[in-house]
Amino acid sequence: MIVIVGLGNPGRKYAKTRHNVGFMVVDELARKYGLVFKEKNDYYITEWRLENKDITIIKPTTYMNLSGTAVKKVVNEKILKNLPESLIVIHDDVDMPLGKIKIKKNGSSGGHKGVQSIIDSLGTKDFIRIKIGIGKNPYQDVSEYVLSPFTSEQRAKIQEKISEAVESIVVIINEGVNKAMNIYNRL
C-alpha cells in the first residue's frame, strides 16, 4: 500500500495559490488516470491501482498547518509498515526556484509547516517528499506570498512542472525513489 498526499489549503479562496501546488499535482494525477476524489473525515480521498500496487491519494482539508492530523488517520488506517517507501508527500518550496522539482527520501521540514505537522504527527522524518519550487518574492512577506496566486506567466511554467511531478510519482511507484531522484533532481 502506498499513500500519496498533496498538501494545500481547502476552498476556492486558496485553489490557485502557490501553497496549493501539492493539491494541483494530485488533482492532475487524478485527471490523467480518471480518478475521482470523495470527501471523508478530514480529507478528500481516491483509490488507485498501478502495476499491482494499491495506492491511496489524499488531500487534507485541515488547512496546511494541521495536515499531519489527516495524514496520521490515513497512515493508521492503511497500516503502512514500510513508511519511508510507502508515504509520498507533495508540497511547495519557497526556497527553490519556480518550477524546480526535488525528490527527497527524508529530512527536516525546511520550514514548511504542513510537512512539520506530518513529521510531528507521525513521529518520523522518514517519508518521500516531492518538493516543487514556487520561488520567492523578496519584497513580500512569505506567508502573504505563498497564499497569493501564480501570475499567468508563472502559471504556464508551473503547469508543465505539475505534469513532470505526476510523471515522477509514477516512476517512484514503478521503479523506486532512487531512480526518480536520478531523473528529476537533475532537471
UniProtKB/Swiss-Prot annotation:
- Organism whose genome encodes this protein: Thermodesulfovibrio yellowstonii (strain ATCC 51303 / DSM 11347 / YP87)
Described by its record, this protein's role is as follows: Hydrolyzes ribosome-free peptidyl-tRNAs (with 1 or more amino acids incorporated), which drop off the ribosome during protein synthesis, or as a result of ribosome stalling. Catalyzes the release of premature peptidyl moieties from peptidyl-tRNA molecules trapped in stalled 50S ribosomal subunits, and thus maintains levels of free tRNAs and 50S ribosomes.
Keyword Hydrolase belongs to the record:
yes
The terms describing its cellular component in GO are: cytoplasm
Reactions catalysed, as given in the entry: an N-acyl-L-alpha-aminoacyl-tRNA + H2O = an N-acyl-L-amino acid + a tRNA + H(+)
Question: What Pfam families does this protein's entry cite?
Answer: Pept_tRNA_hydro
Subcellular location, principal: cytoplasm
What residues does the record give for site: Stabilizes the basic form of H active site to accept a proton?
92
**PROSITE patterns the UniProt entry points to:** PEPT_TRNA_HYDROL_1 (PS01195)
Where, by residue number, does tRNA bind? 14, 63, 65
Molecular function in Gene Ontology? peptidyl-tRNA hydrolase activity; tRNA binding
Family, as annotated: Belongs to the PTH family.
Q: Which domain of life is it from?
A: Bacteria
Q: List the residues marked with site Discriminates between blocked and unblocked aminoacyl-tRNA.
A: 9
Coiled coil regions, renumbered to chain: none
**UniProt subcellular location:** Cytoplasm
List the active site. Answer: 19
Please identify the protein, giving its name as recorded: Peptidyl-tRNA hydrolase
Q: Which HAMAP family match?
A: Pept_tRNA_hydro_bact
